[in-house]
From Swiss-Prot:
Residues that bind FAD: G14, G15, G16, H17, A18, G19
Protein name, UniProt field: tRNA uridine 5-carboxymethylaminomethyl modification enzyme MnmG
Cellular location(s): Cytoplasm
Alphabetically ordered keywords of this record: Cytoplasm, FAD, Flavoprotein, NAD, tRNA processing
Species of the source: Coxiella burnetii (strain RSA 493 / Nine Mile phase I)
Taxonomic path: Bacteria, Pseudomonadati, Pseudomonadota, Gammaproteobacteria, Legionellales
InterPro entries membership: FAD/NAD-bd_sf (IPR036188), GIDA_C_N (IPR049312), MnmG (IPR004416), MnmG-rel (IPR002218), MnmG-rel_CS (IPR020595), MnmG_C (IPR026904), MnmG_C_subdom (IPR047001), MnmG_C_subdom_sf (IPR044920)
Gene field: mnmG
Length: 627
């Protein structure tokens, strides 16, 4: 083993979406950070679908953005197709999705990494961890080079013990074209972590020049184009292109059913559990046998490549079956497959072995983030990487760790779900996982988190000044609207009654009127006496939403305040649950497995009853551990 002379504060292993966010935020907070990757050219690579956001996922992206992260900005700089999902539904469940040019996206990530002070890149795979005095102290690369740091973040994606399946052909790999991390996987299996296998997959890629687009339904970008980042201005967007929609048919399904003998999933070769919410096409055909078609979205991979991503047909069937079923789909009868679809199995570690900071419970200074914790998706990985990077930097600064609570961010929901409940299948974020959806909207992530990000040191001056100006503009306009009185039978009242068919029987403020569902801010401001309107769309949106949902938001905040005291009550890590009178053996076992840090976390462990929480509370009070 050769030692290097450089000493770092934080070492990040892996350069995917978790690793890049972890490295960037640690360096932004002033930590000397080393990012190790087996190939610098693949930093920030979109290994599967070239898209960012979606239902539940764009909430994570915007929270990352609010805390100074790079993902949303890169999506805006590389986005070639943008849509607002659930646009006709309430603001709590609206989402933004950006189809990205994968080359432009990777270039945006590269540029951020290469221009970040306090961050160094080095191309080497990692084979071993250095543990000194029972805590992380560094890593050893494949050529025996030792790098030292008191904190190490593993963001290794699907590379740990990775095994690729195409039909009955199987070979070791971290993803197509990349080697697996076998030595590191073996090293981690020697440590006291609970380890299992998961599986994910990807569809074949298609040459767009061989697609018959005249047979397909075109889906253009929304206009005006939605922005992913709060700090984007929209001037430098790439050229926008359309996606296209087609669907499978009975012939497709027959080909797949007849080809199941070539499926490693259905022949028992694959042991890992696949993603429930992104199943392979063969899994869909078997599970939903009554369906005679499934929708496909044909999504361009970039502006300067003919390759197309057929979203909806992830598969590990043999290549000849892939070719046959693709050719049975309308518009794809003569298409050329450029890359086969495949499944990949990999190691993941039970996230209940992590603290909410994402530091491992058994090895201080060692953090896990991304698919190693059982999640699926770029956005979920990036969110974990950000929190791991923040907490590694805070540890170096000898400051307390920080993770947002469930009532503060979807990131908090994600990490609490993982560290409290664990997962036995790839975990994906949905808005339905959050109890306080109306508070945790994608439109207000900056208002929820940017001040905290500034306190932590991960939001730079430019973003902070932009945020302060926006917040002041919102507050100033709200005060103006509250002071504007509209009297019955006045000229303004008559204009409002005529425009909105709303009878004004008493005096109202302009803010009162915005609480009515029939009236919105831009339309109200078209009445000359009530203007001028604020022109910034994001400010106008906040004024509208905050006015209309004020009552609901006040109720949710009051509910959170009522629960806060007991939810945040600390449980000492040394607590012996055998000494808590009245707990069943099952409850004791679950508490010992998870080792919750607060009563709130304990209450969310599956199988822990309200009665058990009451017994815990009595015990803590008896031991004078609860005020």
């Amino acid at each position: 083993m050769q030692s290097t002379s450089q000493q770092f504060d934080v070492i990040v292993v892996g350069g995917g979406h978790a690793g890049t966010e972890a490295a960037l935020v640690a360096a932004r907070m002033g930590a000397r950070t080393l990012l190790l990757t087996h190939n610098i050219e693949t930093l920030g690579q979109m290994s599967c679908n070239p898209a960012i956001g979606g239902i539940g996922k764009s909430h994570l992206v915007k929270e990352i953005d609010a805390l100074g992260g790079i993902m949303a900005l890169a999506a805006d700089q590389a986005g070639i197709h943008f849509r607002t999902l659930n646009a006709r539904k309430g603001p709590a469940v609206r989402a933004t999705r950006a189809q990205a040019d994968r080359v432009l996206y990777k270039a945006a990530i590269h540029h951020a990494l290469e221009n970040q002070p306090h961050l160094w890149l080095f191309q080497q795979g990692v084979d071993d961890l250095i543990i000194q005095n029972n805590r992380a102290a560094g890593v050893v690369t494949q050529m025996g080079l030792a790098f030292y740091a008191p904190t190490v973040i593993l963001t290794v994606g699907t590379f740990l013990g990775g095994k690729i399946h195409i039909g009955m052909n199987h070979y070791r790999g971290g993803r197509a074209g990349d080697p697996p991390a076998l030595a590191l996987a073996e090293r981690l299996r020697e440590m006291p972590f609970r380890v299992e296998r998961l599986k994910t997959g990807t569809p074949p890629r298609i040459d767009g020049r061989t697609i018959n687009y005249s047979q397909l339904i075109e889906q253009p970008s929304d206009q005006p184009l939605p922005l992913m980042s709060y700090w984007s201005h929209g001037e430098d967007r790439p050229r926008q292109v359309s996606c296209f929609i087609t669907q499978t048919n009975e012939k497709t399904h027959d080909i797949i059913r007849n080809g199941l003998k070539t499926s490693p999933l259905f022949s028992g070769v694959i042991e890992g559990v696949g993603p429930r919410y992104c199943p392979s096409i063969e899994d869909k055909i078997v599970r939903f046998a009554d369906r005679n078609s499934h929708q496909l979205f044909l999504e361009p991979e970039g502006l300067n490549t003919p390759e197309v991503y057929p979203n909806g047909v992830s598969t590990s069937l043999s290549f000849d079956v892939q070719l046959d079923f693709i050719h049975s789909i309308k518009g794809l009868e003569k298409c050329h497959i450029t890359r086969p679809g495949y499944a990949i199995e990999y190691d993941y570690f039970d996230p209940r072995d992590l603290k909410p900071s994402l530091e491992t419970k058994y090895v201080p200074g060692l953090y896990f983030a991304g698919q190693i914790n059982g999640t699926t998706g770029y956005e979920e990985a990036a969110a974990q990487g950000l929190i791991a990077g923040i907490n590694a930097a805070l540890q170096i600064q000898e400051r307390a760790p920080w993770t947002p609570a469930r009532d503060e961010a979807y990131i908090g929901v994600l990490i609490d779900d993982l560290t409290t409940r664990g997962t036995n299948e790839p975990y994906r974020m949905f808005t339905s996982r959050a109890e306080y959806r109306l508070l945790l909207r994608q439109d207000n992530a900056d208002l929820r988190l940017t001040e905290k990000g500034r306190d932590l040191g991960c939001v730079d001056d430019e973003r902070w000044n932009f945020f302060v100006k926006k917040k002041e503009t919102i507050e100033k306009e709200q005060q103006r609207l509250k002071k504007q009185r509209i009297w019955p039978k006045s000229t303004v009242a008559k204009a409002i009654e005529s425009r909105f068919q709303q009878l004004l029987e008493r005096d109202y403020s302009a803010m009162d009127l915005l609480r009515r569902p029939e009236i919105n801010y831009p339309a109200l401001m078209q009445i000359e006496e009530l203007g001028p309107a604020v022109l910034e769309p994001s400010v106008a949106e906040q004024i509208d939403i905050q006015a209309k949902y004020e009552g609901y938001l006040t109720h949710q905040l009051a509910e959170i305040a009522r629960q806060k005291k007991y939810q945040t009550a600390q449980i000492p890590s040394s607590l012996d649950y055998n000494q808590v009178t009245g707990l069943s053996n099952e409850v004791r076992q679950k508490l010992n497995e998870t080792k919750p840090t607060t009563l709130g976390q304990a209450s969310r462990i599956p199988g822990i009853t309200p009665a058990a929480i009451s017994l815990l509370l009595v015990h803590l009070k008896k031991k004078e551990l609860y005020p």
